[in-house]
Amino acid sequence: MNFPDLIPDLKPAMPELRGRLLANAPLAPLTWFRVGGPAQLLFTPADENDLAYFLARLPKEIPVSIVGVGSNLIVRDGGLPGAVIRLAARGFGETRVDGDVIHAGAAALDKRVAETAAAAGIGGLEFLYGIPGTIGGALRMNAGANGGEIKDVLEEATGIGRDGSLHVFRNAGMRLSYRKSGVDASVIFTSVRLRGAIAPPETIRAKMDEVQKHRETAQPIREKTGGSTFKNPPGQSAWKLIDEAGCRGLRVGGAQVSELHCNFLINTGDATAADIETLGETVRDRVKTHSGIELQWEIKRIGIAA
């Protein structure tokens, strides 16, 4: 489907806009599942000031969504009304070192942040090497893996509010918990400051190699997937609950529960977003029936049905 083109009405109010603004832009190529409809508006800001300028002048009735590299995301088949913001590496992907602190733009890949830290002999960020996506997305959901999470290393984060205002958050003020941030969802994170601990680079690299080896042997990283689908319930492993409910290999249309890791859904080639979401809900129902436990989605689902 196509949405009404809003650009002719918006552009006159934004004469100094420097980023790229598109109407009815395909989102499927921007997600790891490779499914979903278009964005009514897709804006790629030139930098933080450009993002603030755009948001301040965007009519308040137009909803705003943020999309990173699409690694933990289902965009529904009807697409996404309103404005979708996508932070690009140019303008938001820088990483730099200051002592035992890593400064990173929100579009920097988690893996790159870990590599930057390792090269500088900064330990404690190895867990990021195994997390797909960008540091902005990791910050939003307090991402974690292999015994570490963002909350452990975060010093400060910067973001832009829906009205274009600048916000700076310290760790405690973000109220980070398991796969959750307490910061208002309308804030778009633009940069982060992470603190590690000085350590021998070879020790850090060895830990990162272990993380990568585990991913390659235990996760379907070469499939069209969104990463871990459901949060682990307290004291439980989501994959084990899914397996025990008989869902390993379960299919709906072109979507399948991974045979390798049950907490991963994959697009076998011709899945729709509806196939993937329906499969996820089927898994949730079967797990609830089998164990009485209600799994919570970890993957973000946005947009409207076709």
Curated annotation (Swiss-Prot):
Pathway: Cell wall biogenesis; peptidoglycan biosynthesis
Reaction equations catalysed: UDP-N-acetyl-alpha-D-muramate + NADP(+) = UDP-N-acetyl-3-O-(1-carboxyvinyl)-alpha-D-glucosamine + NADPH + H(+)
CC cofactor: FAD
UniProt keywords, alphabetically: Cell cycle, Cell division, Cell shape, Cell wall biogenesis/degradation, Cytoplasm, FAD, Flavoprotein, NADP, Oxidoreductase, Peptidoglycan synthesis
Catalytic residues, chain numbering: R179, S228 (proton donor), E298
Pfam families named among the record's database cross-references: FAD_binding_4, MurB_C
Cellular localisation: Cytoplasm
InterPro entries recorded: FAD-bd_PCMH, FAD-bd_PCMH-like_sf, FAD-bd_PCMH_sub1, FAD-bd_PCMH_sub2, MurB, MurB_C, MurB_C_sf, Oxid_FAD_bind_N
Keyword Nucleotide-binding: no
GO biological process: cell division; cell wall organization; peptidoglycan biosynthetic process; regulation of cell shape
SUPFAM superfamilies: FAD-binding/transporter-associated domain-like (SSF56176), Uridine diphospho-N-Acetylenolpyruvylglucosamine reductase, MurB, C-terminal domain (SSF56194)
GO molecular function: FAD binding; UDP-N-acetylmuramate dehydrogenase activity
Family: Belongs to the MurB family.
Name listed for the protein in its UniProt record: UDP-N-acetylenolpyruvoylglucosamine reductase
